Amino acid sequence: IYDDVGSINSISFGYYKKLQERGIPCVTFNPFKPLISVVMNNRDHRKIFVVDGYIGFTGGINLADEYINKVKRFGYWKDTGVRIEGEAVWSLTAMFLEMWNYINRSTEDYSRFLPSVYREKEFTSDGFVQPYGDSPLDNENVGENIYLNIINRAKNYVYIFTPYLIIDHEMLICLSNAAKSGVDVRIVTPGVPDKKAVYLLTQSYYEPLLKNGVKIFQYTPGFCLLYTSPSPRDTR
């Protein structure tokens, strides 16, 4: 699955057909139509890579040369990815299949994609890992609600890498209140923008956040596209 608008400048129209001809099932999310419609704003920026149900990768890395700095479009490109093993991988598989069924109007049997062999080492952990997604199919803002909950519970610090600092009033107040309460709130944004309009909008939030004690830094070597953002972290 790839997002049609997100790939519009990098691959040819109808590229999914070429993959299908080579035996690779492929579909596009929300194909672009030259119409004025709010539906066109529904995009899928998730990156999901699952191998045999045992290993999963997610993060901000797309399939493009700038992500390995083979091509420098916006200075040095900094990104991140996470490798997951064990039961948590199933959440990534389920998110993919949910979107696959929606696009194809199909009812793919999820159980077919469960790991066929139980590997005790991979499924033994004293922690809790729960990948989650946020999509137009949801009836609530899953991602934002999780961020708000984490930030509100933080005791020591909240560190955020984000390529686009575009927040609503509730998130602005949440970050400000955390900083005022003594939590060390830091936000890192790109020093080199990939979209100037979005960059200006990002900067418009600097003043109210700084006034309330939030520390803001810019990644001057280039563009930091850590799409796992905001990624608040806290030690207790």
Predicted regions located by residue number:
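HKD-type phospholipase D/PLD-like phosphodiesterase module
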Residues: 1-152, 161, 165, 169, ...
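A very general structural signal that marks isolated residues within well-ordered alpha-helical segments
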Residues: 102, 164, 181, 234-235
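Helical hairpin unit composed of two closely spaced alpha helices linked by a short loop
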Residues: 164-183
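Single conserved hydrophobic/aromatic residue that forms the stacking wall/gate
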Residues: 227-236
